[in-house]
Amino acid sequence: MTRKQRRLVFIGTCGAVLAVALGLVLWAMSGTIVFFRSPSEIAREAVAPGVRFRLGGLVEAGSVVRGPDSQVTFAVTDNAARLPVRYRGLLPDLFREGQGVVAEGAMEPGGVFRADTVLAKHDETYMPREVADALKKSGRWQEGAGHPAPAPPRTASGEARAP
C-alpha cells in the first residue's frame, strides 16, 4: 500500500469512527429531549397520555387552588387556550397568577397536565423565548408588556431628583 492509500484509509477510518460516535451520542440523548408546547398547540394536536413535554404560558388569574399535601392545581393559558395543570411540591417563590411559567411533565388520561417541575419567570422583564413566541404567534403579545418603568434618577444621598 502506498503512502497516499494509507493516509486515505486512516482518514476514512477516523471519519467512520466519528460518525458512529456522533450517532451514539444522538441516540443516547433522544430519550432526554423534551419539546416545548403552548396550550393552543395542545388544543390543536392530540397529545397521548404519558408523553413528556414542556408546557409554557401564563398562569391564568383565579385558577390557583392549593390542596392538601402541597398539591396545587392551576391553569396555564396563552390567552387563546387553557390547560389545567396538577402539581405536587413546593412552587417557586415567584410563581403567581398572571405571570409566565414553564411546567415539565406529561398529560394524564383525563386531559390534565401532570407537572413534576414548575419554573417561574425570574424578574419583571423575563419570559421564556418559547412562551413569548407562542404568544406572538397567537396574536396575544403586547409589545412592552411586563417591562418595568425606569426608576427615577437619584442623587448621591439617595433622593429622587426631577428628570
From Swiss-Prot:
Cellular component terms (Gene Ontology): plasma membrane
Keyword Endoplasmic reticulum carried by entry: no
Keyword DNA-binding: no
Predominant subcellular localization, coarse grouping: membrane
PANTHER family noted in UniProt: CYTOCHROME C-TYPE BIOGENESIS PROTEIN CCME HOMOLOG, MITOCHONDRIAL
Pfam families according to UniProt: CcmE (PF03100)
Protein name per Swiss-Prot or TrEMBL: Cytochrome c-type biogenesis protein CcmE
GO annotation, biological process: cytochrome complex assembly
Topological domains annotated Cytoplasmic: 1-7
Organism this protein belongs to: Methylobacterium sp. (strain 4-46)
Protein family: Belongs to the CcmE/CycJ family.
InterPro entries attached to this UniProt entry: CcmE (IPR004329), CcmE-like_sf (IPR036127), NA-bd_OB-fold (IPR012340)
